[in-house]
Design a protein with these regions (language model features):
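Catalytic core of pol beta-like nucleotidyltransferases
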Residues: 1-16, 25-30, 41-94
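A structural signal for short, well-ordered beta-strand segments
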Residues: 19, 34-36
Length: 94
């Protein structure tokens, strides 16, 4: 799964991506979604349609529901948990 995610983000305006939640902890069930925290490359604007396309394409590639969250937009109650769980799955080469 992490290789599919990394390969996909190589073609997207993403600088870094982390897996968090149940998949990061190895506690996923058949009902779990894939939680991804991303740092976008804002050198060019990322609109709603591009964001929605990434979300849809990730779901298609993984065959799972995906929760795609931009870094800095997690709700306050989820920040500590996400930071504890998160595992880097992609970082753009410099």
């Amino acid at each position: 799964m992490t290789q599919i995610i990394a390969d996909y983000f190589k073609t997207q305006p993403v600088l870094k991506a982390w897996l968090f939640g149940s998949y990061a902890r190895g506690e996923q069930t058949s009902d779990s979604d894939v939680d991804l925290l991303v740092e976008f490359d804002h050198s060019s604007p990322i609109g709603l349609f591009a964001y929605a396309r990434m979300w849809r394409e990730l779901q298609e590639r993984l065959g799972l529901n995906v929760d795609l969250v931009e870094e800095g937009t997690l709700r306050p109650f989820a920040v500590d948990s996400a930071n504890r769980d998160k595992k880097l799955v992609y970082e753009r080469a410099s």
